[in-house]
A protein has these predicted regions:
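A short beta-turn/loop motif at secondary-structure boundaries
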Residues: 38, 150-153
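A short glycine-rich, His/Asp/Glu-containing loop-to-beta-strand
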Residues: 39-48
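Non-heme Fe(II)/2-oxoglutarate
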Residues: 1-36, 52-56, 98-100
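Short edge beta-strand segments in beta-sheet-rich domains
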Residues: 41, 99-101, 154-158
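A short hydrophobic beta-strand segment most commonly corresponding to one strand
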Residues: 69-72, 152-169
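Catalytic core of non-heme Fe(II) oxygenases with the double-stranded beta-helix
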Residues: 47-136, 141, 146, 172-174
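Short, well-structured alpha-helical interface segments that form or flank functional binding sites
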Residues: 16, 41, 65, 69
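Extracellular/luminal regions of secreted and cell-surface proteins that mediate adhesion/ECM remodeling
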Residues: 140, 165-185
Length: 185
């Protein structure tokens, strides 16, 4: 596998794409907490993965306490593209079925087999890579990529970025209460 830096300064295409992603990040923050923000691009890169490769569960850092990260799927091998989509019709991961080979894994908690019996909500999700799909999430969100097994030259290619976020006003408990009271903003 390889990770290659994608320039976001001094490169016309990189600067343009950085601007688009920063606008999306500002919208993401505004829709999440209802506060306007300013953004700067921290880093952009591509990841080139081949049969047997995976990316262990990790999170991302930014220079600011609040950050946004994203993944865009650029190329997906046939061995992944032909798998079912767990968000549409999913029979689970019983008996190491390979049902999520090459998928992105998001986790924001811990889960166990008895969780449903204890009314504990699911705290993980698998996302099937589809060319052109962009997912954006808080930089603290732990994520990884499941290994896939295809032909030797099959490539799973993604673009990723980390975006620094500075709020234009201080976040208070009032923001939380408003967002969870059912009031419309």
């Amino acid at each position: 596998s390889a990770q290659l830096t994608f320039p976001h300064e001094g490169d016309e295409v990189g600067e343009m794409f950085s601007g688009v992603l920063q606008r999306l990040a500002r919208e993401f923050v505004d829709r999440s907490i209802g506060i306007e923000c300013e953004t700067t691009m921290e880093s952009m890169w591509t990841v080139h993965s081949y049969s047997g490769d995976y990316n262990p569960v990790h999170d991302h850092g930014t220079r600011t306490p609040m950050g946004v990260s994203c993944i865009m799927y650029l190329q997906v091998p046939r061995c992944i593209a032909t798998l079912g989509n767990p968000s549409e019709n999913f029979d689970g991961l019983n008996e190491s079925s390979g049902a999520v080979d090459g998928f992105t894994y998001l986790t924001w908690g811990t889960n166990g087999m008895r969780d449903i019996n204890m009314l504990r909500p699911i705290t993980e999700e698998y996302i099937k890579p589809e060319v052109g799909t962009l997912i954006m999430f808080p930089s603290w969100l732990r994520h990884g990529v499941m290994p896939f097994f295809g032909k030797e030259d099959d490539e799973r290619r993604t673009f990723s970025a980390n975006i620094n976020v500075n709020l234009k006003e201080k976040l208070t408990g009032d923001h939380y209460r408003k967002d969870h009271s059912g009031e419309q903003s």
